[in-house]
Amino acid sequence: MILKETTINNYATALFNIAVKEKLVDDYIIQVDALIKSLADKDEFNKLVTYSNKEQKKQAILIIENTFSSFGFDIYLINALKILVENQLFINTRMILKVLYKKLLAYKNIVLGEVYSTEKLTKTQLNAIKKKISNKVNKKVELVNKIDPTLIGGIKVSVEDKVFDGSIKAKLEALKKQMNT
């Protein structure tokens, strides 16, 4: 069953409050990011933790416990995953974790963004862009590099509701617009 947005937010808020209270925010940022990535496109795993009888339910909960405790995930996160399995709501896990991740980053005054380029950027380039954008938005910025061959050249950065477009495509469009007026 897919949960409503408010219920997803409630789960995320509960986990966020635990992270703050237990002083685990930094750990949760790392662990939640890893969970989001590891559960991407894992329909087989969702099927493993779906059940139709008590024995399968016990197995599903054991799978969660064994899988995630072996990687050192926090017990509160594991228990939340087990609750989702028990209530047959595991399919909502990534949505809950994404909301939680945003709350954790906001708490640390960090924002997520994307930098679009025609080819993969080096770590040095990415760090230089992060620094420049961080200064513009007055927050620490974490960027994900996404490839967009339509840009022709240059980069486009999207952070919060702001877009910083230094691509050749944008410059050509601006020039075209200027010529039409």
UniProtKB/Swiss-Prot annotation:
GO terms for cellular component: plasma membrane; proton-transporting ATP synthase complex. GO terms for molecular function: proton-transporting ATP synthase activity, rotational mechanism. SUPFAM superfamilies: N-terminal domain of the delta subunit of the F1F0-ATP synthase. InterPro entries: ATP_synth_OSCP/delta_N_sf, ATPase_OSCP/dsu. Pfam families: OSCP. Keywords: ATP synthesis, Cell membrane, CF(1), Hydrogen ion transport, Ion transport, Membrane, Transport. It is a peripheral membrane protein. It is found in: Cell membrane. F(1)F(0) ATP synthase produces ATP from ADP in the presence of a proton or sodium gradient. F-type ATPases consist of two structural domains, F(1) containing the extramembraneous catalytic core and F(0) containing the membrane proton channel, linked together by a central stalk and a peripheral stalk. During catalysis, ATP synthesis in the catalytic domain of F(1) is coupled via a rotary mechanism of the central stalk subunits to proton translocation. This protein is part of the stalk that links CF(0) to CF(1). It either transmits conformational changes from CF(0) to CF(1) or is implicated in proton conduction. PANTHER family: ATP SYNTHASE DELTA CHAIN. F-type ATPases have 2 components, F(1) - the catalytic core - and F(0) - the membrane proton channel. F(1) has five subunits: alpha(3), beta(3), gamma(1), delta(1), epsilon(1). F(0) has three main subunits: a(1), b(2) and c(10-14). The alpha and beta chains form an alternating ring which encloses part of the gamma chain. F(1) is attached to F(0) by a central stalk formed by the gamma and epsilon chains, while a peripheral stalk is formed by the delta and b chains. Belongs to the ATPase delta chain family. This is ATP synthase subunit delta. It comes from Mycoplasma mycoides subsp. mycoides SC (strain CCUG 32753 / NCTC 10114 / PG1). The gene is atpH.
